[in-house]
From Swiss-Prot:
Belongs to the universal ribosomal protein uL5 family. GO terms for cellular component: cytosolic large ribosomal subunit. The lineage of its organism: Bacteria, Pseudomonadati, Pseudomonadota, Gammaproteobacteria, Lysobacterales. GO terms for molecular function: RNA binding; rRNA binding; structural constituent of ribosome; tRNA binding. The keyword Protein biosynthesis does not apply. This is Large ribosomal subunit protein uL5. This is one of the proteins that bind and probably mediate the attachment of the 5S RNA into the large ribosomal subunit, where it forms part of the central protuberance. In the 70S ribosome it contacts protein S13 of the 30S subunit (bridge B1b), connecting the 2 subunits; this bridge is implicated in subunit movement. Contacts the P site tRNA; the 5S rRNA and some of its associated proteins might help stabilize positioning of ribosome-bound tRNAs.
Length: 180
């Protein structure tokens, strides 16, 4: 069961990157490993309902149940203690990862207000890409009227690319909307 984006990768992206970087074997071509979604909900320390709504939103967006993240240390200025739930995260792999990226690239990112593309500088030096989304309502799975608060999330795309140039070429081949 190949998704649309996975089929596109095998038929179009692999030959294009082999030609661009001079790979001799298709297994050398960088590929997507996982997409990690993280939502930090600082207000969850005082109100548990906020965290429940964040978990529900993320499960709708990702298609699987997220893990509740807990604080590691007590911070008096943030009014949190060690072990209190303060967010949620989920890791998408294989088919769910490709489905999520397909929706992100073709539906969600164009729905962002004043969208001019994502920054091409958000690579970590080892071929992974990180980006933030300011509001979860850009995803089609979220009903705008049922949202209690606008929350953002972090999206980390992990690849097998050795360099940032390879990773950027991989994501650009997937028609990822880079600004520059």
């Amino acid at each position: 069961m190949n998704t649309r984006l996975e089929k596109f990768y095998k038929e179009n992206v692999v030959p294009a990157l082999m030609k661009e970087f001079g790979y001799t074997n298709p297994m050398e071509v960088p590929k997507l490993v996982k997409v990690t979604l993280n939502m930090g909900v600082g207000e969850a320390a005082t109100n548990k309902k906020i965290l429940e709504n964040a978990v529900a939103d993320m499960s709708k967006i990702s298609g699987q149940k997220p893990v509740v993240t807990k604080s590691r240390v007590s911070v008096a200025s943030f009014k949190i203690r060690d072990g209190w739930p303060i967010g949620c995260k989920t890791t998408l792999r294989r088919a769910k990862m490709y489905e999520f990226l397909d929706r992100l690239i073709n539906i969600s990112l164009p729905r962002v207000r004043d969208f001019r593309g994502v920054s091409g500088r958000s690579f970590d030096g080892r071929g992974n890409f990180n980006m933030g989304v300011k509001e979860q309502i850009i995803f089609p799975e979220i009903d705008f009227d049922a949202v209690d608060a606008i929350r953002g999330m972090d999206i980390a795309i992990t690849t097998t690319a050795k360099t940032d140039a390879e990773a950027k070429a991989l994501l650009a081949a997937f028609k990822f909307p880079f600004r520059n």
